[in-house]
């Protein structure tokens, strides 16, 4: 999500705590997306849809070498629902559904000395994963349920450094950030529910755990952007250390492994002062690749987007479409995603300069 944010329209990155020290005013970024996924297997086909807030960030600076930012961003969204019937040897009907969300709210502060800025981010991460398994025999009026609920939270600390400078013909910036390993605390509940009638229900707890359950892994990120007049090029990548094994009762067991991602994007604006409307648009293209800690396959994606600057303003809006594939041997998934975003830039808290 947000594959072009590293270069597209100069949007700031929540993963880089030092970005606000290089601003020249107040900036608010807002973006959301809608996504449709199609999964294909040799004997089945499924279509799912989802949508969410992608980024909400407010940054400001007084123009004297320091900045402050706050924001909200989703870390992960997942879910599925399956249903099947068996006739032999014992007929029954079963369903299995899983949904999970994880979000992070954060505060950032940054200080700049000449072309170098240092930043710190404090984040609060919370997530909920719920799995519901149901089994119903022909003799049952109501199904039996296996309910699994996992709630996690963590305090996340990130440090970042950002170097930004320019020459007569070029401008460039280089950024690095490191997220520290953090303990994940919360509760895990695994229960069985037997419905004798609409009013008589038996509940049995199979597993309950509370306290420190796992660790949120450390990660490294780096990126570089290069621009000249009407075009801009950006490259970004990240590496995340291996998380712990996913071995809670009620979920599939999975061993964690290290993961990485890389993205490349380019933006071109023919002539910002042209009278023709299409010459004032910002044209974007990008590509993206990612591996996952609990899945063997990789994600390959490409993005196309356009941006438009508001008249007589530094604020911009953009629209992008992304296509991605998860190549696999038995189950293949591909998706379309449409993202819409706005970046408002104003000169609040900055003293006007009179030459």
Residue positions per predicted region:
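N-terminal, post-signal peptide beta-strand-biased segments of exported outer-membrane/organellar beta-barrel
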Residues: 1-74
């Amino acid at each position: 999500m947000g594959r072009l944010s590293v270069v597209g329209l100069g949007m700031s990155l929540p993963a880089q705590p030092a970005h606000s020290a290089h601003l020249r005013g107040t900036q608010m970024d807002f973006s959301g997306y809608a996504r449709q996924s199609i999964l294909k297997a040799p004997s089945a086909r499924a279509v799912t849809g989802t949508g969410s807030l992608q980024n909400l960030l407010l940054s400001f600076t007084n123009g004297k070498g320091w900045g402050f930012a706050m924001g909200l961003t989703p870390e992960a969204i997942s879910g599925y629902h399956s249903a099947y019937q068996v006739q032999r040897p014992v007929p029954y009907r079963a369903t299995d559904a899983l949904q999970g969300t994880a979000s992070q709210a954060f505060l950032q502060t940054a200080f700049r000395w000449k072309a170098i800025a240092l930043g710190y981010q404090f984040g609060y991460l919370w997530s909920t994963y719920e799995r519901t398994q149901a089994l119903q025999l022909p003799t049952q009026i109501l199904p039996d349920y296996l309910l699994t609920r996992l709630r996690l939270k963590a305090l996340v600390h990130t440090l970042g450094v950002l170097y930004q400078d320019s020459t007569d013909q070029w401008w460039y910036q280089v950024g690095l950030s490191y997220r520290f390993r953090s303990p994940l605390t919360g509760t895990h509940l695994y229960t069985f529910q037997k419905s004798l009638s609409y009013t008589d229900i038996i509940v049995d707890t199979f597993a309950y755990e509370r306290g420190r359950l796992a660790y949120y892994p450390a990660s490294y990120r780096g990126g570089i952007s290069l621009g000249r007049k009407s075009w801009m090029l950006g490259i970004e990548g990240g590496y995340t250390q291996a998380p712990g094994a996913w071995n809670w009762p009620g979920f599939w067991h999975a061993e964690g492994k290290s993961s990485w991602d890389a993205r490349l994007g380019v933006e071109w604006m023919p002539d910002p002062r042209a009278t023709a409307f299409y010459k004032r648009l910002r044209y974007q293209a990008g590509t993206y690749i990612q591996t996952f800690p609990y899945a063997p396959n990789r994600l390959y994606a490409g993005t196309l987007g356009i941006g438009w600057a508001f008249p007589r303003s530094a604020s911009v809006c953009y629209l992008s479409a992304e296509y991605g594939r998860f190549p696999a041997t038995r189950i293949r998934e591909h998706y379309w995603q449409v993202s819409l975003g706005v970046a408002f830039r104003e000169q609040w808290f900055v003293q006007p300069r009179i030459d």
